[in-house]
Amino acid sequence: MGMPNLGDMMKQIQKAGEKMQDVQNQLEKLVAHGESGGGMVKVSVSGKQKLLSLRIDPEIMDDAEMVQDLVIAAVNNALDASAALAQEEISKAAGGMINPADILKNMNLGK
């Protein structure tokens, strides 16, 4: 067996970097949704786990503690959905060659 061709290895590394940049761009465009309290609180987050929107049913605004609990639950729900979408995109890009959880940790998006 001969040594691997350094030029081929560099091309593969460059391709992998380009794929990961594509994934980063895709994550910017993805939106995940979460809700709690039967839809009384709804949130949307990006694939990069940034909060995009928050909607609270005005009828529950007089119960601050409940609103706080529902917001936390809805945001966590949306963040979990966002992480799942990110893993899916990374898996597609990597073609099974890398562990998506490792990539998400490196991007500060994993648990």
UniProtKB/Swiss-Prot annotation:
Record's subunit section? Homodimer.
Q: Which family does it belong to?
A: Belongs to the YbaB/EbfC family.
Name of protein: Nucleoid-associated protein Clim_0875
Q: What does this protein do?
A: Binds to DNA and alters its conformation. May be involved in regulation of gene expression, nucleoid organization and DNA protection.
Signal peptide coordinates: none
> What is its subcellular localisation?
Cytoplasm, Nucleoid
**Which Pfam families does the entry link to?**
YbaB_DNA_bd
> Which Cys pairs does UniProt list as disulfide-bonded?
none
Write the lineage as a comma-separated list. Answer: Bacteria, Pseudomonadati, Chlorobiota, Chlorobiia, Chlorobiales
